[in-house]
Each structure stands twice: as structure tokens, then as C-alpha cells.
């Protein structure tokens, strides 16, 4: 029956933005429509709640949210891959910003206090402030609920400063030619970490222990399909953008 088929579907949740970019070819593959049920959320909290309640089997999450989920489920999830490295950028049309010290006295708009973008900005900001003699507290951080809000704000006011993931950074710059990439946060992270330091892991894929225990073959098949979909996204960016 239709109901029993829906119960057999592997329920996959992801966030709008870079964590979903590697999934888009899977989402649009009709041959997989009877295997996966995809949902996209605007905020990580929605995915956490769905994983805790058992409404999702697999979720693509910010790395820090995955650690929160691990604790909430008392260790009943596993990380099965890293789906996003970096992809965060500081964007502005303010020509006076050429260094971290130039952010003093300005407001930076970003999403989610205590989420991955927050950590990715604050860590190098503190390190650069200590190294270059300015106070990190002089940089005001203002949090918005979604990256689309920041992209819209920047396109209307290019002198503002925002932290955006792809593809939102590119979308904002296409809407206002004054905007530019001020910092690639992956490069800034690497500068602070130094040679041999940790890489900027921003997104991971987690799966419930119950799915691993009851259907390990399905997990392996998902990993293969996800890898193929992500490779297509990288090799055919124009086609991926159209999806």
C-alpha cells in the first residue's frame, strides 16, 4: 500500500544552503523517488528535533549541531561523512575594509548565535584582535534567522558586512555589483591554525543507529549516491545551480 511504501522510505533532512548542494542531484533523480524522502529546513533546530523524535533517519547538519544531537540522543547517531568544508565568506561593498582591524566599530550580520558561522567568525576574529592590537568586542555581531535575510540586506545596503555561505554569497553579489568577497573564511581559519592545524569542517552527515542496525546496506547505498551527487555538483556547477 501507499502507507507501507512511505514507511520504507529513508527520510533525509538537510539545511537550505551549502549542506544541500551535494544532494540536489539525488533529490532530482526520479529513480530514487521510491527510496528517499527529502526535506529541507531553514534552521538546524528543525532537523535536530526531527532526528530526536525519529522522524528522520539521516540528516546533513552543521558540525556543531551534530555534537548537540549526539548528546540529545545519548549517542544514538553516527557521523558517516563530512559534506562541507569551509564555504563561508565575509561579504561587503565597503572599500575601507581590507583587514580584520578594519571591522572595529562595524556590525557584522550572520546567522545563528552559537552555530557554525558564529564559531567560524569569532575564532579568527579573537586571534586577529590579539595579534593586531584591537578589541574583538568592538566588532558588533548581529544575528539573523536565515542567510537569505543577510543576502537581501547586503544587496540593499552594500556598505553593510555579512557572513554568508555559498550560494548565498554569490547571489548577493549578483544583485549588487558593489559587493565583494572580503575574506574567504577557510583561508582565514587556515592562517590562524597554521601548518598541520585542523581543517574547517562546517557540515557533516549523521545517521540514526537504528537505521545502521536494521539496514546497513541502505546506509552504504546512500553514501555512494551522496558521493556521486556531490561529484556531479562540483563538475557541473551550472547544471546544479539550475536545479
What feature does the model see in each segment?
Residues 46-47, 148-150:
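Short acidic active-site motifs
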Residues 2-143, 160-161, 166, 177, ...:
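Short, glycine-/small- and polar/acidic-enriched structural segments
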Residues 99-102, 146, 235-238:
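Alpha-helix capping and helix-coil boundary motifs
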Residues 64-65, 149-242:
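Pocket-lining segment of extracytoplasmic ligand-binding domains
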Amino acid at each position: 500500500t501507499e502507507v507501507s511504501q512511505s514507511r520504507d522510505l529513508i527520510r533525509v533532512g538537510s539545511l537550505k544552503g551549502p549542506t544541500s548542494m551535494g544532494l540536489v542531484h539525488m533529490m532530482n533523480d526520479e529513480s530514487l523517488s521510491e527510496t528517499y524522502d527529502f526535506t529541507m529546513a531553514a534552521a538546524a533546530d528543525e532537523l535536530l528535533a526531527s532526528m530526536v523524535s525519529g522522524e528522520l533517519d539521516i540528516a546533513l547538519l552543521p558540525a556543531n549541531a551534530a555534537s548537540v544531537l549526539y548528546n540529545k540522543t545519548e549517542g544514538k547517531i553516527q557521523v558517516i561523512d563530512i559534506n562541507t568544508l569551509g564555504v563561508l565568506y565575509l561579504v561587503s561593498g565597503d572599500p575601507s575594509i581590507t583587514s580584520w582591524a578594519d571591522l572595529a566599530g562595524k556590525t557584522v550580520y550572520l546567522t545563528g548565535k552559537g552555530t557554525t558561522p558564529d564559531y567560524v567568525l569569532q575564532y579568527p576574529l579573537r586571534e586577529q584582535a590579539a595579534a593586531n592590537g584591537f578589541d574583538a568586542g568592538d566588532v558588533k555581531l548581529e544575528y539573523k534567522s536565515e542567510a537569505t535575510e543577510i543576502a537581501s540586506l547586503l544587496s540593499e545596503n552594500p556598505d553593510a558586512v555579512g557572513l554568508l555561505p555559498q550560494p548565498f554569497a554569490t547571489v548577493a553579489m549578483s544583485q549588487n555589483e558593489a559587493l565583494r568577497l572580503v575574506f574567504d573564511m577557510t583561508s582565514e581559519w587556515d592562517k590562524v591554525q597554521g601548518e598541520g592545524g585542523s581543517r574547517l569542517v562546517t557540515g557533516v552527515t549523521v545517521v540514526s543507529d537504528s537505521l545502521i542496525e536494521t539496514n546497513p546496506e541502505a546506509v552504504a547505498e546512500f553514501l555512494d549516491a551522496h558521493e556521486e551527487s556531490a561529484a556531479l555538483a562540483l563538475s557541473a556547477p551550472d547544471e546544479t545551480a539550475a536545479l
